[in-house]
């Protein structure tokens, strides 16, 4: 019988010693976690931990409110 396929869990890109800080002013970093339409990509796709995903979404929403990021992209 064949072994069932399983995916290796990716590590969080914001954990570790040299990990980048989540900041609402760092637009280039935040755009990496948004879809091409401007939506926040879920953590199961980006492998971000739950705590860091909350910080990330808060930073994206803050940057949107200030006007650094668009709400939607047409």
Swiss-Prot record:
Family named by the database record: Belongs to the bacterial ribosomal protein bS18 family.
Protein role: Binds as a heterodimer with protein bS6 to the central domain of the 16S rRNA, where it helps stabilize the platform of the 30S subunit.
Species name: Novosphingobium aromaticivorans (strain ATCC 700278 / DSM 12444 / CCUG 56034 / CIP 105152 / NBRC 16084 / F199)
Full protein name: Small ribosomal subunit protein bS18
Gene3D superfamilies membership: Ribosomal protein S18
Complexes and interactors: Part of the 30S ribosomal subunit. Forms a tight heterodimer with protein bS6.
Keywords: Ribonucleoprotein, Ribosomal protein, RNA-binding, rRNA-binding
GO biological process: translation
GO cellular component: cytosolic small ribosomal subunit
């Amino acid at each position: 019988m064949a072994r069932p396929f399983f995916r290796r869990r990716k590590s969080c890109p914001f954990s570790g010693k040299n990990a980048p800080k989540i900041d609402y002013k760092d637009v280039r970093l935040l755009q990496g976690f948004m879809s091409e339409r401007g939506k926040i990509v879920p953590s199961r796709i980006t492998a971000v931990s739950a705590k860091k995903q909350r910080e990330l979404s808060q930073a994206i929403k803050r940057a949107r409110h200030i006007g650094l990021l668009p709400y939607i992209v047409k």
